[in-house]
Regions:
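Low-complexity, glycine/proline-biased repetitive segments and flexible coils/loops
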Residues: 1-187
Length: 187
């Protein structure tokens, strides 16, 4: 059975002898993400990232493809990379690593653990499970996202609930960071 990677903002990597998922399905410019990597047989391709296609896996026993790199953003001050692709699973070989930006690592078929989950608050993709017959490990969970609002210093920002934060950028601007659903009040 061919395993097809799902399309999305960034595409999923191809499973054994399958096809990779397309990225940027919304048709945005600049693009919001790239396609997953392909495979010819065996190991899976890596998931696409915000700035790069996931790596393809070669013919068995090649390792799983690495996840595509995410996008750096310095809205908080120091640059942080977000939305890396998950690594492809390995078949009797090494699994792919997650892409920079929180992508989870893939798993090989030496056991039944699922693929690694994406890093929280980065939007990184989950890594692929392996192919340990008869058990087929599941893929890892995608990392939760984050919303950051930046305003000039003259504004006052209040956020709820308390899990979200209101801080000051090193340059003086105000920042509201949301890691859970909440409300922003600007005055």
């Amino acid at each position: 059975t061919r395993k097809v990677g799902a399309a999305g903002g960034s595409g999923g990597g191809a499973g054994e002898a399958g096809t990779a998922g397309a990225g940027n399905v919304g048709g945005f410019s600049p693009v919001e993400g790239f396609a997953g990597g392909g495979t010819s047989d065996g190991s899976g391709g890596g998931g696409g990232g915000a700035t790069a296609v996931g790596a393809s896996a070669g013919a068995w026993p090649s390792p799983g493809g690495n996840g595509g790199a995410g996008a750096p953003n310095d809205i908080l001050g120091p640059a942080t990379t977000y939305a890396g692709g998950g690594g492809g699973g390995g078949q009797n070989s090494t699994a792919g690593t997650g892409g920079a930006g929180g992508g989870g690592a893939g798993n090989n078929n030496g056991g039944s653990p699922p693929g690694g989950s994406g890093t929280v608050n980065t939007g990184g993709g989950g890594g692929s499970g392996g192919s340990a017959t008869p058990c087929v490990p599941s893929g890892g969970l995608g990392g939760s996202g984050i919303v950051i609002v930046r305003t000039p210093s003259s504004y006052t920002l209040a956020v709820t609930p308390g899990t979200n934060t209101s801080t000051t950028h090193p340059g003086g601007d105000k920042l509201a960071t949301f890691t859970v659903t909440g409300t922003l009040t600007v005055s």
